[in-house]
Regions:
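Active-site-adjacent helix-turn-beta-strand microarchitecture at beta-sheet edges
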Residues: 101-196
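Domain-core and long-helix interface of multi-subunit machines
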Residues: 169-170, 174-241
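Short acidic-glycine loop/turn motifs at beta-strand connectors
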Residues: 62-65, 135-141, 186-187, 208-212, ...
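Solvent-exposed loop/turn segments at secondary-structure junctions
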Residues: 65-66, 99-103, 141, 212, ...
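Short, conserved catalytic/metal-binding motifs centered on acidic residues
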Residues: 94, 206, 251
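Zymogen propeptides
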Residues: 1-145
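Exported/periplasmic cell-wall-interacting domains
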Residues: 228-230, 236-261
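Short, solvent-exposed aromatic-acidic interface loops
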Residues: 72-78, 148-152, 219-223
Length: 261
């Protein structure tokens, strides 16, 4: 299955000129397909997604400056459930994302890197191979950056130079035990896949449209409602349908969760 479902690497840097963040504050706008979008008072629209082997929901957040990383920092042995982090941050919605220490099912510490409001709260980019940063810079543009092999000092310099505001890490790894991947769409170019690109699993992904709106997608799988889950191909198709210029996988499996109050 792994050999039948692979993907080519994506090395292009994001072209920020393709994103022009809208200053429109209306709760009703027209999307890329000419359809009227109705946002709630928080500037959020929820969409239900149905695929061949998954069901999902997407949050479309009109103002990308409202999307931030929430964590349990300062780090400890035990983490929190997503709804606790969302409520603690005074937010109305959230999804999971990024790598964390899963041994013992305690989830108190991240893996790789974490940036919150411009501050690096976890800095170990060389602890795992194949790491990517997924986050937003201070201009509220989605960033998907290969940080494989960076030292902690290199990463600190990169965060300062690139103006990274909030970010987590996920991993590119194709093996018998893992089928992890990160870039899905870069500069309107979809990742080239062999087969479906990956197996089917619950997934969490992020994208950004040309108008700056953020797309947060979570799908089910692993037998939930009889669904196997979403493949890399599925994620790309959904993100393209909803106008993503750039998109990346954030996490998957039993961690995939969405909260929306």
């Amino acid at each position: 299955v792994i050999n039948a479902n692979k993907m080519e690497s994506m090395d292009s840097d994001i072209d920020t000129s393709l994103i022009n963040i809208s200053s429109d504050t209306d709760t009703q706008t027209v999307d890329n397909n000419g359809e009227v979008e109705q946002f709630d008072g928080n500037g959020i629209r929820m969409v239900e997604i149905s695929g061949r082997s998954f069901f999902g929901k997407m949050l479309i957040i009109k103002d990308p400056s409202q999307v931030k990383v929430g964590t349990t920092y300062p780090w400890g042995d035990y983490g929190k459930e997503l709804h606790e982090i969302v409520n603690g941050a005074g937010a109305v919605a959230g999804v999971n994302g990024g790598l964390y220490v899963s041994s013992g099912n305690r989830g108190g510490s991240p893996l790789g890197i974490v940036v919150q409001d411009g501050k690096i709260t976890y800095n170990s980019p060389s602890a795992l191979s194949g790491l990517y940063l997924i986050g937003l810079n201070k201009d509220n543009l989605l960033v998907v950056k290969d940080i494989d092999g960076m030292s902690a000092a290199d990463f600190e310099s990169y965060v300062n130079e690139a103006g990274i505001r909030d970010a987590v890490a996920f991993q590119e790894e194709s093996s018998d035990s893992n089928n992890h991947f990160v870039p899905l769409i870069i500069n309107n170019e979809a990742r080239v896949l062999k087969g479906q690109g990956s197996g089917a699993n619950p997934r969490t992904a992020i994208g950004q449209r040309a108008d700056g709106a953020i797309l947060l997608l979570v799908t089910d799988g692993r037998g939930a409602s009889g669904h196997l889950g979403a493949t890399a191909s599925d994620l790309i198709s959904v993100m393209q349908e909803y106008g993503a210029v750039n998109a990346a996988n954030l996490d998957g499996g039993s961690s995939s969760t969405m909260v929306y109050n």
